């Protein structure tokens, strides 16, 4: 168990352990997006910073098969930010909120030495997609293509810039895939810390392991901030899942099967 999972385990209750807390039909989720931890200001614009901060938070709601409704923003801003910078930051928040029909209903602002953002999303669902309920024999799949986020991060450190279509800033949320397949899904979560690190969370929550159908490269296994979906479903629903993924225009890769073996994550933790 890595240090992040260890710390979270100190607060165990029936609400903690998923992408958000499901309470009386609502999902409450919160994520941080901090300068010099998740991004460097010289890498991307204020507009892009706000967009990504909103998208990574909406990802948690969508990953739980919930419809995002409201957002609360907390923004710690350096005094060096100009009014134009603030307008660009606000424009990024508002554009993504409008696209996903989310209303920004409040929050907090403070002065700080760097730009730090935390967002709370309030969503609604009748059938939450949880991380528990995984059993021996289930198939394991991920959406989209993994590994590009890590490659783009390496480019940022080496070159200091990215192409406009980089996955580091252009996150694709798999709303259609989740909503169109939720009937067949047994469990799921978004891939934010990397495929193997997020598999570790599932393994710990369900006391299971995984048998991989083929070797997985380091880039695919350990690339964080992908925000693709990690999904679990019954073997008998394999054809249906692949068909519905195709209808959603989402690549779906089945790469493992759930076993009773112990699972060991071989990737370094991103947060601790």
Where are these regions (language model features)?
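Active-site-proximal betaalpha loop/short-helix elements
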Residues: 80, 168-226
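Short hydrophobic/aromatic beta-strand micro-patches
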Residues: 122, 230-234
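N-terminal glycine-rich phosphate/pyrophosphate-binding loops that anchor nucleotide-derived ligands
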Residues: 1-62, 102, 138, 214, ...
């Amino acid at each position: 168990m890595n240090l992040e999972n260890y710390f979270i385990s100190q607060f165990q209750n029936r609400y903690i352990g998923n992408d958000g807390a499901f309470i009386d039909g609502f999902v409450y989720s919160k994520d941080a997006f901090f300068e010099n931890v998740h991004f460097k200001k010289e890498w991307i614009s204020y507009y892009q910073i706000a967009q990504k901060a909103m998208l990574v938070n909406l990802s948690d709601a969508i990953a739980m098969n919930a419809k995002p409704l409201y957002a609360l923003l907390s923004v710690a801003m350096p005094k060096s930010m100009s009014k134009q910078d603030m307008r660009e930051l606000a424009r990024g928040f508002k554009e993504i909120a409008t696209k996903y029909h989310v209303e920004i209903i409040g929050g907090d602002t403070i002065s700080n030495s760097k730009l730090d953002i935390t967002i709370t999303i309030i969503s609604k669902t009748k059938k939450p997609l949880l991380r528990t309920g995984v059993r021996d024999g289930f198939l394991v799949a991920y959406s989209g293509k993994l590994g590009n986020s890590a490659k783009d991060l390496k480019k940022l450190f080496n070159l200091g810039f990215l192409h406009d279509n980089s996955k580091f800033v252009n996150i694709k949320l798999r709303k259609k895939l989740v909503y169109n397949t939720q009937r067949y899904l047994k469990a799921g979560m978004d891939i934010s810390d990397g495929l193997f690190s997020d598999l570790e969370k599932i393994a710990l929550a369900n006391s299971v392991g995984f048998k991989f159908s083929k070797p997985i490269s380091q880039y695919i296994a350990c690339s964080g901030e992908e925000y693709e979906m990690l999904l679990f479903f019954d073997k008998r629903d394999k054809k249906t899942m692949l068909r519905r993924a195709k209808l959603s225009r989402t690549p779906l890769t089945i790469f493992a099967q759930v076993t009773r073996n112990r699972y060991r994550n071989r990737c370094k933790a991103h947060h601790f």
